[in-house]
Amino acid sequence: MGLPRRAGDAAELRKSLKPLLEKRRRARINQSLSQLKGLILPLLGRENSNCSKLEKADVLEMTVRFLQELPASSWPTAAPLPCDSYREGYSACVARLARVLPACRVLEPAVSARLLEHLWRRAASATLDGGRAGDSSGPSAPAPAPASAPEPASAPVPSPPSPPCGPGLWRPW
């Protein structure tokens, strides 16, 4: 079967493929209904052997009934926004750093405490102002800093990049 040379050939080709496509579509529907029956019967407490002759409509009705009876809390929730994901990742990273940094003794304790205080403050400001952790022109909220954190010195620590709120959020991992 090459490319049709005339309009009549194309029509013939469509005519011959139509039953084949319909057969495949019906096979997919039947396979999906069979899988659905296999999934829904155990959840309803019925045995597969007793219900082998269920009609397609029965399987669909049982599925609809089962889904209607599910509590609303078990329904899947919407995916988090990229901004929320960024904030959660940033906070988790700072929390991990707060556990590791004092133990590895790479920095002096005062510098380490100042760095952690700054990072916690940035995480809190990103949460409070809806994800924009840009310039801190206003007062920031108290940050959950370590208990032994000394007062910050005058040397500023670079701030993390502000979380982008968009579909093209790039992640290094």
UniProtKB/Swiss-Prot annotation:
It comes from the Eukaryota. GO terms for cellular component: chromatin; nucleus. One of its GO terms (molecular function) is DNA-binding transcription factor activity, RNA polymerase II-specific. Residues 141-166 have a biased composition (Pro residues). CDD domains: bHLH-O_HES2 (cd11463). Its main location: nucleus. It is found in: Nucleus. GO terms for biological process: regulation of neurogenesis. Residues 13-70 form the bHLH domain. A motif (WRPW motif) lies at residues 170-173. It holds the Pfam family HLH. Residues 128-173 are annotated as: Disordered. Residues 86-119 form the Orange domain. Expressed in placenta, pancreatic cancer, colon cancer with RER, cervical cancer, and in head and neck tumors. The keyword Repressor applies. PROSITE patterns: BHLH, ORANGE. Keywords: DNA-binding, Nucleus, Repressor, Transcription, Transcription regulation. InterPro entries: bHLH_dom, HES_HEY, HLH_DNA-bd_sf, Orange_dom. Transcription repression requires formation of a complex with a corepressor protein of the Groucho/TLE family. Has a particular type of basic domain (presence of a helix-interrupting proline) that binds to the N-box (CACNAG), rather than the canonical E-box (CANNTG). Transcriptional repressor of genes that require a bHLH protein for their transcription. This is Transcription factor HES-2. It comes from Homo sapiens.
